[in-house]
Amino acid sequence: KLIVLIGCGSFIMCDELNRQWPDIPMILCGERDYTGPKETMIREHALPRTERIPISDLQKKYNLTLMQSSVYLNENLQLMKQLIPKMDKVMYIGDETYICQQNDYDLSEIIREKYPELDYQFLSAKDIRTDSLFNILNHVNPHTTGVIFSSWLYKSSPHDNIMRSNSHRVISTAPIPLFSLRAIGIEEEGGIVGGYIYNKEKYNARLLETIHKILDGTPARNIPLYYPDDGAPVFNYKSLLQRDLNPKLCPKGTIFYNMPPTFWEKYEYVIISITAAIITLLFFFQYLRLQSLSRIKRLQQQQLDSNLKYRNL
């Protein structure tokens, strides 16, 4: 048996799962390497530093390991400042889920400590209706404001316990560029232009490798916590242009989706075919030239032999 928990909010289930199946191996997949008091997590409040419990401490009690799907908050802010040189304000679009509340808490803290020149605003689905969000975004100056989009889950009424998503509508109709902390939505042309994210293919491969190790008998607690070290700027080239952002401002090493092919990529096969044809023709003409020279040489030799023959007479 093996349990994979997805999302930081699910980490509070470790105690109950361990009680149900003692020492069952667990893999925690989430954006943070800590959890907190169950009561705080259930209320979906952000965890201040004083309440955070490192996952490494849980390994002493539970048979688990961590696969952190890192969110690079500081790197994304640096990236936004690079693409929006006149940026003086950051907006974060999220909802009342725990991870959005935690991102809001951490973003406000980072901006206060490292970017005091920036204003910050959290737009939450808990407090703002979708139509009101569009009205706000329509009045945003994209040359001075950077917007990070996370998710847009909401309740249709205060008594509704079901969270509904309107993320697709927000992304597809947003009139401004939306930066993201995750890879979702970047490959498609639209509102999400990109962000600083980890390599999801490598992450998935490492997750499968970890699963196989545990199923082969390695205790989960003996597997080191995994932190991606391959974060990089990832952007949709066409989305950048559609949202009036200059791809040339992206840092070196940026990964682009939908980037137009270079001259070589576009005409590679044509160039190779023409080059091959020219080389073939050159070889053919060289062959004809050698044949002609050989024929002339034979005629000259015949003429020389004839002259010698007549001279001997």
Model-derived regions, located:
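An alpha-beta-alpha
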Residues: S56-I111, L225-N236
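Beta-alpha junction/loop-to-helix N-cap segments that form part of ligand/metal-binding clefts
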Residues: K1-H45, S156-S157, R164-S165
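Structural motif
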Residues: L5-G9, C29-R32, Q68-V71, I93-T97, ...
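Membrane-proximal low-complexity regions enriched in glycine and acidic/polar residues
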Residues: L66, P116-T218
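Hinge/cleft segment of the Venus flytrap/periplasmic-binding protein
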Residues: D216-I272
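Hydrophobic alpha-helical segments within soluble ligand-binding/sensing domains
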Residues: G36, L47-P54, T65-M87, N199-D216
